[in-house]
Amino acid sequence: MAKLSCSYFFILMLVFSALLMVECDEGKRCHTTIDKGNFCDLVDCRLSCFSGYNGVGKCFDDPKVPGRSNCGCLYNC
């Protein structure tokens, strides 16, 4: 019985990890940070995001990334 439970648990973990590996589905919005560590200029941020990802760029503060403001890009996955 213990072997059977362990096998089911292992299969369940494989299925769960496969679902986690899928980053984005169609129609979902993804976010990436552009030019980490550089001060965000809104015009350059929006231009970089639109040309690179066909998305919308905005400046934001991120405590994990040094600097006053960073460029974030929202785009369709």
UniProtKB/Swiss-Prot annotation:
GO terms for cellular component: extracellular region. Coiled coil: none annotated. Disulfide bonds join 30-77, 40-59, 45-71, 49-73. It is found in: Secreted. Keywords: Antimicrobial, Disulfide bond, Fungicide, Plant defense, Secreted, Signal. It comes from the Eukaryota. InterPro entries: DEFL. Residues 1-24 form the signal peptide. Its main location: secreted. PANTHER family: DEFENSIN-LIKE PROTEIN 159-RELATED, DEFENSIN-LIKE PROTEIN 184-RELATED. Belongs to the DEFL family. This is Putative defensin-like protein 160. The lineage of its organism: Eukaryota, Viridiplantae, Streptophyta, Embryophyta, Tracheophyta. The gene is LCR26.
